[in-house]
């Protein structure tokens, strides 16, 4: 049995009815469990977390792609988050005894499948990449939708599958295989966007900061706050508590406090327990108490214990 997680990102965060249709498409497949969904108006982006055996998960993904291709028009899309298509990115993540090589195989097969069905260009990234300059998602998304639309026919920008032209409304999609990624945002108690961008440059690995951390600064209109938005590519290398404390120190140097933080999607239970250990929570406390201690330390907004992947999947299987 090959268990897999996928976390497709869709370029729609303002129309609830469209996000509902995306979620319904996933839930229509027996054996595919929709564990989480988030919707962000400023980023104009929604994220679904799907887990289960490989076959139902890939079927659920294909049904969701069909909805996105029909409902989301990239010609009129705008938002804070970088993107290249209505379905911007589809990662396959190994769970249980599934290996990253298994996920590479799934990603490549699925990429070809949706390229053929929807006549949409597909770029393989991360462990599924077929060339070194496409390992990083940021390299695949260089120039975003508008830039790729202008360059897709040029040498070096041709897709792995599908036509060397953008789908007229859905754009392109990146499909890959990667280890578990934690999407983690910290909101500053400040409206200073430039400060958020400076902090992001200092904490991300490419700027000499924290290993396995990507970061950008954004303005979040509905909160009226500046945000440091991050991807933790390996929480065992740079844990959540270290990210929080590093951003806290950088902000404090400018006299700014941290308002709160948030997870986009789910995170492994071990990543929360690591924070609880750092916060001094007794190791023999119940898991729920240790999760609460971790959430308090990180000032996690709207936290639920069900944001721990293992707890959410167990609950979904019991339902």
Named regions from a protein language model:
Residues 1-319:
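Long, contiguous binding/interaction regions
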């Amino acid at each position: 049995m090959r268990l897999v997680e996928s976390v497709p990102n869709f370029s729609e965060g303002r129309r609830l009815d469209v996000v509902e249709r995306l979620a319904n498409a996933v839930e229509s497949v027996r054996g595919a469990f929709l564990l989480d969904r988030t919707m962000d108006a400023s980023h104009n982006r929604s994220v679904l977390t799907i887990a289960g055996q490989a076959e139902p998960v890939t079927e659920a993904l294909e049904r969701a792609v069909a909805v996105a291709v029909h409902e989301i028009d990239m010609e009129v899309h705008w938002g804070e988050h970088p993107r290249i298509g209505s379905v911007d990115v589809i990662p396959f993540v190994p769970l249980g005894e599934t290996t990253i090589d298994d996920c590479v195989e799934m990603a490549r097969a699925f990429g070809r499948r949706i390229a053929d069905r929807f006549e949409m260009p597909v770029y393989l990234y991360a462990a599924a990449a077929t060339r070194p300059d496409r390992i990083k998602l940021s390299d695949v998304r260089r120039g975003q939708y508008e830039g790729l639309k202008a360059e897709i026919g040029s040498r070096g920008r041709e897709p792995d599958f599908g036509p060397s032209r953008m789908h007229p409304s859905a754009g392109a999609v990146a499909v890959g295989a990667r280890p578990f990624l934690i999407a983690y945002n910290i909101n500053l108690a400040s409206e200073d966007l430039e400060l958020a961008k400076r902090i992001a440059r200092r904490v991300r690995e490419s700027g000499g900061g924290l290993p396995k951390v990507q970061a950008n600064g954004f303005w979040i209109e509905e909160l009226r706050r500046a945000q440091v938005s991050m991807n933790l590519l390996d929480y065992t290398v740079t844990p959540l508590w270290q990210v929080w404390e590093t951003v806290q120190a950088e902000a404090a140097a400018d006299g700014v406090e941290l308002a709160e933080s948030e997870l986009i999607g789910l995170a492994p239970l071990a990543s929360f327990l690591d924070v609880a250990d750092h916060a001094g929570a007794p190791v023999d406390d119940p898991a729920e108490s240790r999760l609460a201690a971790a959430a308090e330390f990180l000032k996690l907004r709207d936290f639920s214990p069900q944001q721990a992947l293992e707890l959410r999947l167990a609950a979904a299987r019991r339902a």
